[in-house]
Amino acid sequence: MVIKSALKLISDAYAPSVLTLSTFESGTRAEESTQRAAGVTRDKNVNPFISLYEDVLLPSEQWEDYGLVGISIVGISQILPGLTLARTLKEKYPHLHVTLGGPIFSVNAKQLLDHPEFFDEFCHSVVTFEGEEPLHRLLTALKQGTALKEVPNLLFCEDGKVTLNEERVELRFEELPAPTFEGLPMDLYLSPYPILPVLQSRGCYWGKCTFCTHSFVYGHRYGKQRTKQMVDELEGLAEKYQTKYFTFSDEAVSPHSLNDVSEEIIKRGLDMKSLALLKFEKVMDEQLFQKMRQAGFIFLMYGLE
């Protein structure tokens, strides 16, 4: 209640903006257009992040030591905080290459072709779809001074013209390294223990819902980790970060995967507590749920389509 009350006071000071533990709404519909967004990212009367970044974030790092900063914007409530950070860095540190990424841009990439002002205001480039290999190639291009047109999955602006590199590069799951959380201030998160996000799969094993954009973001492609690799990752992260709490951030974990991962966790005798997102399936029965509970799946969130 204390934190909620504090956020309510902050929201009142920046009305009509509303800030909660998980969302930010400006009350100006600025997320709907680049012009409105540009205005709100400069307006200290409604945007609490401007002062936060200028007073706390910028002095905390030696930005002159960096050559590139990547900002991932996943959901709508992150648009204004993310763009405010991008604009602030781009203005304060002209040597930085600011690149944006995340599902928001993958879905709306072609709309940015008609908005060169977006790049003037916020960033130098945008990585669309899966970003591991494009980001690596972007870093290489910047280091070697080669043309950005050779970087796949990239939007950029030159001489007032926005270009979208159509080439798509996607890695197989076995090519992806385990996640790392080095450098993150884990002790500052509002939880008694670190709760680490992991991915057992990318895309959706169903992938047929016409209202959903997740399959589009992954190119209507589905891939998943092998069971042993997944549990190896969980075990390694648990030991490295001294936690037993995990969130499976998949769009939906398949029943088959849940069964196999649960069996492997039980087999190894691991003590874990996990959250997972699921889709209702007829094959989900009491036996599966008992096995999942034994493996530490204590919080399940269902999508009902």
Task: Mark where each language-model region is.
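Canonical Radical SAM [4Fe-4S] cluster-binding loop centered on the CxxxCxxC motif
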Residues: 191-228
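Conserved, mostly hydrophobic/aromatic
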Residues: 154, 204, 230, 248
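Flexible loop/turn segments at secondary-structure boundaries
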Residues: 76-80, 106-108, 135-136, 163, ...
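Glycine-rich beta-alpha loop elements in corrinoid/cobalamin-binding modules
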Residues: 26-166
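Extended, charge-rich helix/loop segments that form flexible
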Residues: 1-43
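Conserved SAM/AdoMet-binding glycine-rich loop
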Residues: 68, 95, 99, 231-305
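Glycine- and acidic
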Residues: 66-72, 122, 194-195, 214-220, ...
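N-terminal [4Fe-4S]-dependent radical SAM core
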Residues: 42, 157-198
